[in-house]
Regions:
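Vicinal oxygen chelate
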Residues: 9-17, 58-65, 74, 79-97
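Catalytic micro-motifs at enzyme active sites that drive phosphoryl/nucleotidyl and oxygen chemistry
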Residues: 78-79, 110-113, 119
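Core segments of cupin and vicinal oxygen chelate
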Residues: 4, 15-63, 98-99, 105-115, ...
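Conserved short beta-strand elements that form part of the metal-binding/catalytic scaffold
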Residues: 33-80, 122-139
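Generic beta-strand structural signal
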Residues: 87-89, 118-120, 128-130
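Short, flexible helix/strand-to-coil boundary loops that buttress conserved ligand/catalytic motifs
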Residues: 73, 82, 103, 144-145
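A short, polar/charged loop-to-alpha-helix boundary motif
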Residues: 139-148
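Short helix/turn-capping signatures at newly exposed starts of structured segments
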Residues: 2-11, 68
Length: 159
C-alpha cells in the first residue's frame, strides 16, 4: 500500500513573486484573510544542505480549504517565473517519520529536511511535490488557519 494512502490534506502550497499582490488577488477571488506574512529567518536543510533562509510565508483558510503562500526565493524549492503558481500539497500523518522514510525508500527525493526528519518536502520521480507534516507542525498550521477563519468572520460581520 502507498504510504500516502488515506492521509489528510492540510493545505495547498502556493509560491508567488510578490506577496502583497498575490494576497490581494487571492483574497478577492477566494474571500481569504491572510495571517502572518512577516519575513523570518528559518534554519532549514534544503537540497541536503543546512541553510538559513529569509522567508515570507502567509496562511489563510476558507474553512473548507487551507492555503500556504510563500514568496519566491532563488535557488530553493520556492521558485517561480509566474505571478502565482500552485506549488505543493501538504499531507498530515501521525506517523510522519515512517511516511517520510517510506517515501525515500520509494525513490522520492527529499528537498526539504534532513534525512530522518519527521517532516519535509518530497518530489516523486515524475515531479509531484508533496509536503509531509506530523502532529506538532499540524497544530502550528491549524492555529494560523483558525486565526484566518476568525478574521474572515469578523470582516463578514462588519460588512
Amino acid at each position: 500500500m502507498s504510504p500516502l494512502a488515506g492521509l489528510a490534506i492540510v493545505h495547498t502550497g502556493l509560491v508567488c513573486q510578490d506577496m502583497t499582490a498575490a494576497q490581494a488577488r487571492l483574497s478577492e477571488s477566494l474571500q481569504l484573510s491572510w495571517i502572518d506574512d512577516n519575513r523570518e529567518e528559518w534554519p532549514l536543510t534544503v537540497f541536503g544542505k543546512p541553510v538559513s533562509l529569509n522567508l515570507r510565508i502567509a496562511h489563510a483558510s476558507t474553512g473548507v480549504a487551507n492555503f500556504e503562500l510563500i514568496e519566491a526565493v532563488p535557488d530553493t524549492p520556492w521558485v517561480t517565473s509566474q505571478a502565482i503558481v500552485q506549488h505543493h500539497v501538504c499531507l498530515h500523518s501521525p506517523e510522519s517519520s515512517e511516511v517520510c522514510h517510506s517515501l525515500e525508500a520509494l525513490g522520492y527525493q527529499r528537498l526539504l529536511g534532513a534525512a530522518g526528519d519527521p517532516q519535509g518536502y518530497f518530489q516523486d520521480p515524475d515531479g509531484l511535490l508533496i509536503e509531509i507534516v506530523g502532529d506538532t507542525l499540524l497544530a502550528y498550521l491549524n492555529d494560523y488557519y483558525e486565526q484566518s477563519q476568525r478574521a474572515m468572520a469578523r470582516a463578514n460581520d462588519a460588512a
